[in-house]
Amino acid sequence: GVRFGDRVDTMSEGKFKIKVYDPGALVAAWETFDAASKGAIDSAWTTPGYHAGKYPGLAFMTTVPFGPAISEFLSWKWMGGGNAIRDRVYAKHDLYALDCFSHGPETSGWFKKPITDLEQLKGMKMRFFGLGAKVMSKIGVSTQLLAGADIYPALERGVIDSTEYSMPTNDIKYGFYQIAKNNYFPGWHQQSSVSEFLM
């Protein structure tokens, strides 16, 4: 987001400025939809999956468990009608979005204890996102959605036993490996992920 704001400033020769706030500074990640719709914020870097509580189908606009590779997923979004569906939902709330970045498969998660079979997951408390959280709940995992910055403290305090978040190159910045030392591949729940610039 910061880099985007800097580029807009440069490209407009200072005529258009975007002030970027840290995640959660103005509203929680999953409140950006309503906040932007009501004009409390002008825009947000977000992901449609955060708004699935309002419109469950939006989860499909971010990622699909056991889903397609990023090239196929973006083809569906851009050429197969996926974004047209999203745009119709957003238009009802005076919102518009642009896909702004994507990334490849995630890991299955960071765990405090080694996992050797599904039975060990039963009763576990785990931060999990999107449709994958529904799968984990079916096998007995107590899932909750936390913003990136809230995961490490939750692991540290024992609020959660494990987490999935992103790819290791992103996860390492949050330090999950310091507490949950077991990381498993591949991330079946997010073969590719797409985020958006919501305005």
Predicted regions: what they are:
Residues G1-F73, N83-M199:
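N-terminal secretory/targeting leader peptides
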Residues W76:
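Short beta-strand-centered segments that line the small-molecule binding cleft or hinge
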